[in-house]
Amino acid sequence: MAKEYSRTQRIGDQMQRELAELIRREVKDPRVGLVTITAVDVSRDLGHAKVFITVMGEETPDAVQQSLKALNSAASFLRLHLGRSMQLRSVPQLHFHFDESVSRGVHLSALIERAVAEDRLHKDTDEQDTKE
């Protein structure tokens, strides 16, 4: 039976769970808002991990940058705790990035809703024109 996930995917998934808990429990920096870890991409050699986050509530570019700065400065602290909890021989270096897919998805949903509303409006005006 073949493995469903590669080792890097399994480690990335576990890192995502562990980091979410560590950030919630251990990081006391006020610059870190309500952070959600959306994905962790681990390199094949397990040397680096890109941690993608979203910041709930405060979605201004300044708030996002402050959260990223705080998390990147706490990366070595988080890496140390990850090493203890995950029992890996070498823990990847953490690089935090803002995940724009959520905001892009919200923007696309708004565009779709607006297009549907305009289509309904045109349909209603066309029906009224044909009745007259």
Swiss-Prot record:
<dbReference type="Pfam" id="PF02033">
    <property type="entry name" value="RBFA"/>
</dbReference>
<keyword id="KW-0963">Cytoplasm</keyword>
<dbReference type="InterPro" id="IPR020053">
    <property type="entry name" value="Ribosome-bd_factorA_CS"/>
</dbReference>
<comment type="function">
    <text>One of several proteins that assist in the late maturation steps of the functional core of the 30S ribosomal subunit. Associates with free 30S ribosomal subunits (but not with 30S subunits that are part of 70S ribosomes or polysomes). Required for efficient processing of 16S rRNA. May interact with the 5'-terminal helix region of 16S rRNA.</text>
</comment>
<dbReference type="GO" id="GO:0043024">
    <property type="term" value="F:ribosomal small subunit binding"/>
</dbReference>
<keyword id="KW-0690">Ribosome biogenesis</keyword>
<protein>
    <recommendedName>
        <fullName>Ribosome-binding factor A</fullName>
    </recommendedName>
</protein>
<dbReference type="GO" id="GO:0005829">
    <property type="term" value="C:cytosol"/>
</dbReference>
<comment type="similarity">
    <text>Belongs to the RbfA family.</text>
</comment>
<dbReference type="InterPro" id="IPR000238">
    <property type="entry name" value="RbfA"/>
</dbReference>
<comment type="subunit">
    <text>Monomer. Binds 30S ribosomal subunits, but not 50S ribosomal subunits or 70S ribosomes.</text>
</comment>
<dbReference type="InterPro" id="IPR015946">
    <property type="entry name" value="KH_dom-like_a/b"/>
</dbReference>
<dbReference type="GO" id="GO:0030490">
    <property type="term" value="P:maturation of SSU-rRNA"/>
</dbReference>
<dbReference type="InterPro" id="IPR023799">
    <property type="entry name" value="RbfA_dom_sf"/>
</dbReference>
